[in-house]
């Protein structure tokens, strides 16, 4: 039998954890001073007036390196718990982890062939 009163603590937690950020934004919106002027529209660089053009364009290589780093960082996050419990999980989980590593190797070879790992 499905009883809703067993989930009262969950619903209370959900409502409270949703209400706190909403209240924080509402209170800060009401209490914050609203001042408009030229100082509000200017760029802020460590308290000094910006010299030259404040808009900088980054090369796409930075984003490619960041993307490859995130992929391998996530790989480490997923493989570490598996390595710590390898003796308990057995062969089927080893096969799944092997397939996961193969997919990541295919992805890294693809990134390498596309030139995402070259800095020039």
Curated annotation (Swiss-Prot):
InterPro entries reported for this sequence: NAD(P)H_OxRDtase_bac/plastid, NADH_UbQ/plastoQ_OxRdtase_su3, NDAH_ubi_oxred_su3_sf
Entry EC number(s): 7.1.1.-
Catalytic activity: a plastoquinone + NADH + (n+1) H(+)(in) = a plastoquinol + NAD(+) + n H(+)(out); a plastoquinone + NADPH + (n+1) H(+)(in) = a plastoquinol + NADP(+) + n H(+)(out)
GO cellular component terms, A-Z: chloroplast thylakoid membrane; NADH dehydrogenase complex
Record's keyword terms, sorted: Chloroplast, Membrane, NAD, NADP, Plastid, Plastoquinone, Quinone, Thylakoid, Translocase, Transmembrane, Transmembrane helix, Transport
Name of one Pfam family that matches: Oxidored_q4
Membrane topology recorded in Swiss-Prot or TrEMBL: Multi-pass membrane protein
GO molecular function terms listed in the Swiss-Prot or TrEMBL record: NADH dehydrogenase (ubiquinone) activity; quinone binding
Sequence similarity: Belongs to the complex I subunit 3 family.
General function of this protein: NDH shuttles electrons from NAD(P)H:plastoquinone, via FMN and iron-sulfur (Fe-S) centers, to quinones in the photosynthetic chain and possibly in a chloroplast respiratory chain. The immediate electron acceptor for the enzyme in this species is believed to be plastoquinone. Couples the redox reaction to proton translocation, and thus conserves the redox energy in a proton gradient.
Protein name (Swiss-Prot/TrEMBL): NAD(P)H-quinone oxidoreductase subunit 3, chloroplastic
